[in-house]
């Protein structure tokens, strides 16, 4: 059985983010195009299966019993926003470009839990379960994901992979869909091998401009 959580309300800061997104249509201005930076709030799009990384206050009915993570086709769901944070405090200053090979945390904006994986089987495929874990952005070392990309920094127009630091699996979707109570949502899981199933692209969101002193920043930003 799946179970609903406590339904914690979003705080004022999170509501402010969502208001800004609604006023901008969920898209950053053209002049902000370029690099993904620390502190940005965005949606992640799986390019193979065309779903956005998603979570919600519904727990797995098997495995860890932690908050579930799925993929959704809708582009306008507020439960698909994630904040880019450093692996440790001070490691990812606000506005600094995310480096290829850098470890980051992806914090779900509306519930404050971090993207997480561990050695539990996923419900539909028996791959590695991916969940959302922690409170107010504080979790553990199994919340760390390495950004795998070409070049020096994570570019918004480029597809990247997220490889889990602790278990080496890649954040993946292979197309399987859940029934009730989250009918039509896709299973998100960890897979051992790099493939088209684990390519992700930055989509709608608020992108913090690179700081002037940050290396690799674009002049027009």
UniProtKB/Swiss-Prot annotation:
InterPro entries (alphabetical): MIR_dom_sf, MIR_motif
Entry keyword Signal: yes
Signal peptide range in chain numbering: 1-28
Chain span(s) of sequence motif Prevents secretion from ER: 218-221
Domain MIR: 33-87, 95-150, 151-205
A Gene Ontology term for the protein's cellular component: endoplasmic reticulum lumen
Pfam families on file: MIR
Localization (cell): Endoplasmic reticulum lumen
CDD domains on file: beta-trefoil_MIR_SDF2_meta (cd23293)
Keywords, ordered alphabetically: Endoplasmic reticulum, Repeat, Signal
Superkingdom of source: Eukaryota
PANTHER family: STROMAL CELL-DERIVED FACTOR 2-LIKE PROTEIN, STROMAL CELL-DERIVED FACTOR 2-LIKE PROTEIN 1
Name under which the protein is recorded: Stromal cell-derived factor 2-like protein 1
Organism: Bos taurus (Bovine)
């Amino acid at each position: 059985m799946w179970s609903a959580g406590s339904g914690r309300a979003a705080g004022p800061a999170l509501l402010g983010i969502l208001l800004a997104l609604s006023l901008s249509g969920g898209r950053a201005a053209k002049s902000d195009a370029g690099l993904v930076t620390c502190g940005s709030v965005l949606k992640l799009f799986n390019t193979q299966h065309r779903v956005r990384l998603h979570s919600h206050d519904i727990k797995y009915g098997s495995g860890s019993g932690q908050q579930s993570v799925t993929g959704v086709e809708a582009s306008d769901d507020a439960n698909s926003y994630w904040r880019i944070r450093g692996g440790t405090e001070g490691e990812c200053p606000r506005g600094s470009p995310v480096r290829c090979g850098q470890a980051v945390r992806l914090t779900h904006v509306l519930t404050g839990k971090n993207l997480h994986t561990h050695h539990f089987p996923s419900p539909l495929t028996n791959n590695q379960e991916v969940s959302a874990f922690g409170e107010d952005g504080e979790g553990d070392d199994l919340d760390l994901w390495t950004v795998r990309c070409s070049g020096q920094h994570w570019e918004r127009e480029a597809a990247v992979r997220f490889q889990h630091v602790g278990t080496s699996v890649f954040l993946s979707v292979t197309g399987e869909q859940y029934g009730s109570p989250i009918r039509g949502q896709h299973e998100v899981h960890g897979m051992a091998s790099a493939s088209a199933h684990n390519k992700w692209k930055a989509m709608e969101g608020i992108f913090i401009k690179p700081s002037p002193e940050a290396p690799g920043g674009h002049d027009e930003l």
